[in-house]
From Swiss-Prot:
One of its GO terms (biological process) is inositol phosphate biosynthetic process. Keywords: ATP-binding, Kinase, Nucleotide-binding, Nucleus, Transferase. This is Inositol-pentakisphosphate 2-kinase. PANTHER family: INOSITOL POLYPHOSPHATE KINASE 1 (PTHR14456), INOSITOL-PENTAKISPHOSPHATE 2-KINASE (PTHR14456:SF2). Pfam families: Ins_P5_2-kin. GO terms for molecular function: ATP binding; inositol-1,3,4,5,6-pentakisphosphate 2-kinase activity. The EXKPK motif is conserved in inositol-pentakisphosphate 2-kinases of both family 1 and 2. A motif (EXKPK motif) lies at residues 125-129.
């Protein structure tokens, strides 16, 4: 069976095998440590993320699978400079969330789309980042200004501006734009759900930081005129990331170009 490279994250790499995505942890240099992390992480996802009532039906389906480290996996692990000190590897296995024959088009720093040649199915991938916040400024908009990113829209505000900004000149079907806009304006949209989830766990920093870094997929079908939402990247964050977050928050708090919050947070 042939492995097909799918993508890479900061601490993982994904391959397609027999129609499913195998997600391999690269967080540690030793396979045995990655195996322990994957098992703990899978438990965290089930107990802390999938258990949230507003997200239970949109967290990507996944299973934990122990695979024998044969030649094809040995080559992958060696390419990633992982020390192979175990005969088996723990993988999180998930469905592929876009059509296999689709092409990917980067829209900006946080957005990309996958589409087939006939535009009958389009999948929009995006990271909405921090939605709920207790500050009087919008963390996303302020962080974009701090980083010098020319991003005027916000996932918390004005869905029409989001659609106009991201899809202007992209030659996507009008039906797609209409259906996606209607979805984003609904109270059941994935951004509204994530806002509610982040607010719900605001006193649980570990879970909150996970929810602030998820990736969303919205898959649209021309045949059914439906939009299906899925979230991935729901991993537990390492404790040492907290120092980075704290230093970023200090920089944002003193940044003169802070952007006013779009919601009246309580």
């Amino acid at each position: 069976m042939t492995l097909l490279f799918v993508g890479r994250g900061n601490a993982n790499v994904c391959y397609l095998l027999s129609g499913e995505v195998y997600r391999i942890s690269l967080r540690h240099q030793k396979l045995s440590r990655n195996n322990a992390y994957v098992q703990d992480n899978f438990q965290f996802i089930d107990s802390k993320i999938r258990s949230l009532p507003m997200l239970a039906d949109v967290v990507v389906s996944m299973r934990l699978e122990e695979v024998f480290v044969d030649t094809k996996w040995i080559n992958v692990l060696k390419d990633e400079n992982i020390l192979i000190d175990d005969s088996h590897m723990q993988c999180i296995v998930m469905p592929l969330l876009h059509a296999k024959d689709s092409t990917c088009e980067q829209l900006d720093h946080f957005n990309q789309i996958y589409r087939c040649s006939l535009n009958d199915a389009i999948t929009w991938e995006f990271k909405p980042k921090w939605l709920y916040q207790s500050s009087d400024y919008c963390r996303n908009c302020t962080h974009n200004s701090l980083k010098g990113r020319d991003i005027e829209y916000c996932f918390l505000h004005d869905p029409e501006l989001i659609i106009e900004t991201l899809f202007a000149g992209r030659q996507v079907p009008e039906e797609f734009l209409d259906d996606i806009l209607q979805y984003l304006q609904s109270s059941d949209s994935i951004t509204q759900r994530l806002y509610a989830a982040q607010r719900f766990v605001k006193d649980d920093l570990s879970t909150l930081m996970t929810l602030r870094d998820v990736t969303c997929f919205l898959t649209w079908s021309r045949n059914t005129r439906s939009v299906k939402a899925t979230i991935i990247d729901v991993d537990q964050k390492p404790a040492n990331k907290l120092r980075h977050w704290q230093s970023t928050e200090s920089a944002l708090a003193s940044f003169p170009g802070k952007k006013k919050a779009h919601f009246n947070h309580q």
